[in-house]
Amino acid sequence: MKNINPTQTAAWQALQKHFDEMKDVTIADLFAKDGDRFSKFSVTFDDQMLVDYSKNRITEETLAKLQDLAKECDLAGAIKSMFSGEKINRTENRAVLHVALRNRSNTPILVDGKDVMPEVNAVLEKMKTFSEAIISGEWKGYTGKAITDVVNIGIGGSDLGPYMVTEALRPYKNHLNMHFVSNVDGTHIAEVLKKVNPETTLFLVASKTFTTQETMTNAHSARDWFLKAAGDEKHVAKHFAALSTNAKAVGEFGIDTANMFEFWDWVGGRYSLWSAIGLSIVLSIGFDNFVELLSGAHAMDKHFSTTPAEKNLPVLLALIGIWYNNFFGAETEAILPYDQYMHRFAAYFQQGNMESNGKYVDRNGNVVDYQTGPIIWGEPGTNGQHAFYQLIHQGTKMVPCDFIAPAITHNPLSDHHQKLLSNFFAQTEALAFGKSREVVEQEYRDQGKDPATLDYVVPFKVFEGNRPTNSILLREITPFSLGALIALYEHKIFTQGVILNIFTFDQWGVELGKQLANRILPELKDDKEISSHDSSTNGLINRYKAWRG
């Protein structure tokens, strides 16, 4: 990968001039000038997904200049580098190959001259065999009963992805009850343990090193709880499995290393649901559906790696995001799924984007003088409409939004879905076109009221519009289409990282807090007054000690 400061490129300078021409152009004007705008600014993927980006403050010239930026930053070369197993995560000297985990074509992918696909396939086969034994009831707990509940213990990528996917694909789930524990706050695991029976519960401990503080604290608490009922430590092996590479620590915990599912250092945590970390997904929806999830992602991988940039969905969404983030000064993006099963999707890509591209140092080691990753947030519709859409519609901040919805619902109750989708369509129309003062006044006249007598309230009912959105309409949320959607966002994030000249696949920003917490933890063991920190931290620790009793 080349290290190119995007702001020093000719394309960036051209975009800056173009922005001066575009900053006062409205979405309404763009639609008024071109009746064919939708067909020019939308792409259908695999007859499963329609991405409409027409309600953006862009023209064909805008996209052409953004494509020039991608070319000048050698995006095509970076894509090739990632897919070929080059060690593009240079700060950790690692390849980045989540695409290998879902490489259903099984073509060789080399890391250090070795094809990784045989090992990938071997772990998948092991996951298949194990999951089928659990789901069928062939696997018995220590009292001879079948497993009814699965508790995934992990944090970050070992929790967010599996939890998001198992929730999104609940219509495909089997009889097993899924639970997820991540927070080191004892409340999290305590509440889950109240719901399960030690005789019929399987715990998955997801930690590559088997040393992650939060995960191992929860795992040991689960083990202690289990042994209070089971007594003999030999029974641990029937109720615990590990998603890890540390065979020694796994064995010492009491887990049979035959039930340790490995992954590799070229799998980043926030891209790991496709790996053994996805075992909870397999247990929830079955192996065949998990393969469909992989297949959907693989289809998007092929689209991303082979489609010209002009019709390449991850590239288009990435470039539009850069347009708002780096030229309009938008600081956030909202992800708004109109599907209750997708209620963790925004949270998943909050990590996916902010941990990937929340960097202030470029690939040359220099502090950047431009914006990098945006703040990502969102909630399902229509809940968000009654919470924060007020600011999106009438606030002073530009918030570009992705609206996501399925055409077909898994729960066709009465006219619920039509009402949901009517809101989905209405919101992007309202954000784009708004409501003028003239329309507000005419509405008053139609009600037999004189707008002049209501002049004090009219300004508050005006919507400026010109708020940008993308609409992603899925035929239906299936394992395949969800896999494709996740991969779409993954590759969007990668594309932005390439152009912004940052390392997307490390996360050094999570380390300092952990180091300081490890230093503070021994200081909390006694009641001595602390004076080794700044006055604020000392004061907080000392008040905690006084109040805890």
Swiss-Prot record:
GO terms for biological process: gluconeogenesis; glucose 6-phosphate metabolic process; glycolytic process. Its EC number is 5.3.1.9. It comes from the Bacteria. It catalyses: alpha-D-glucose 6-phosphate = beta-D-fructose 6-phosphate. Pathway: Carbohydrate biosynthesis; gluconeogenesis; Carbohydrate degradation; glycolysis; D-glyceraldehyde 3-phosphate and glycerone phosphate from D-glucose: step 2/4. Pfam families: PGI (PF00342). It is an enzyme of class 5 (isomerase). Gene3D superfamilies: 1.10.1390.10, Glucose-6-phosphate isomerase like protein, domain 1. It comes from Escherichia coli (strain SMS-3-5 / SECEC). GO terms for molecular function: carbohydrate derivative binding; glucose-6-phosphate isomerase activity; monosaccharide binding. Keywords: Acetylation, Cytoplasm, Gluconeogenesis, Glycolysis, Isomerase. The lineage of its organism: Bacteria, Pseudomonadati, Pseudomonadota, Gammaproteobacteria, Enterobacterales. Catalyzes the reversible isomerization of glucose-6-phosphate to fructose-6-phosphate. The active site is at E355 (proton donor), H386, K514. The modification N6-acetyllysine is found at K80, K228, K234. Belongs to the GPI family. This is Glucose-6-phosphate isomerase. NCBIfam families: PRK00179.1. Coiled coil: none annotated. HAMAP family: G6P_isomerase. One of its GO terms (cellular component) is cytosol. It is found in: Cytoplasm.
